[in-house]
């Protein structure tokens, strides 16, 4: 729904009353499916076209591989929703219903691994980079979830997908996660991610020089050229230029 004075649509909370005895992980997992022949043909034709007709590097979004992305939890494309759809309820379920979340992710991963194989066959080396996750793990000052929760619920499935991609292709893998995720980065590297975006340098602990010193040999940092919360929208042109120049010196 778009507010009368707004410029974008708000996702309405359509959480149905939760009956713990009838709660079925497959209601959330139903959001994911194996790619169709038409989907694969589109990916194959598009990547080949850009590969043969341009000198651009090509990255492809692999659908259905972001575990717990709260932009997708409400399932705004569905007429009716089942399962856990309220974002606050979802985050609480990471602690209150971990078995439920695990089963959702387990089914999602099963489907995602099939899609990795299909996409690898469809586009091969026409792509150089793939986007698999836009799940934000950080707030301004800390992580959304504890490291133990990440390691038990998210990491096993992310690693399974990344390992399969690296096994079948030469693609590099990037994850998008805003926020203060410094403490999570070693686990992201261990899970097989090659590139981190957007590098929110305004968040706690996300100093560009320190990130490069600590993790630069294992991870590509894509972004972080300027503080997009303060300097870019509110700074003077000279302040923007200076910050970008300072950031370039880190590279």
What are these regions, as identified by a protein language model?
Residues 4-7:
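Low-complexity, serine/threonine/proline-enriched polar segments
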Residues 9-251:
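Active-site loop segments of alpha/beta catalytic cores
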């Amino acid at each position: 729904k778009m507010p009368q004075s707004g410029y974008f649509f708000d996702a309405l909370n359509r959480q149905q009353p939760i009956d713990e005895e009838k709660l079925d992980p497959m209601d959330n997992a139903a959001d994911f499916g194996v790619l169709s022949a038409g989907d694969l043909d589109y990916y194959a034709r598009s990547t080949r076209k850009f590969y043969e007709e341009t000198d651009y590097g090509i990255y492809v979004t692999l659908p259905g591989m972001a575990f717990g992305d709260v932009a997708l939890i409400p399932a705004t494309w569905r007429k009716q929703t089942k399962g856990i759809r309220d974002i606050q309820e979802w985050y609480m379920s990471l602690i209150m219903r971990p078995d439920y979340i695990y089963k959702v992710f387990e089914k999602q991963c099963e489907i995602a691994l099939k899609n990795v194989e299909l996409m690898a066959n469809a586009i091969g080396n026409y792509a150089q980079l793939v986007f698999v996750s836009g799940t934000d793990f950080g707030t301004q000052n800390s992580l959304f979830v504890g490291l133990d929760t990440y390691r038990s619920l998210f990491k096993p499935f992310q690693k399974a997908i990344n390992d399969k991609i690296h096994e079948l292709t030469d693609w590099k893998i990037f994850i998008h996660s805003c926020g203060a995720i410094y403490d999570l980065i070693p686990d992201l590297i261990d899970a097989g991610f090659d590139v981190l975006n957007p590098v929110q340098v305004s968040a706690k602990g996300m100093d560009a020089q320190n990130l490069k010193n600590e993790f630069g040999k294992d991870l590509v940092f894509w972004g972080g050229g300027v503080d997009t919360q303060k300097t870019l929208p509110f700074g003077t042109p000279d302040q923007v230029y200076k910050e970008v120049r300072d950031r370039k010196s880190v590279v």
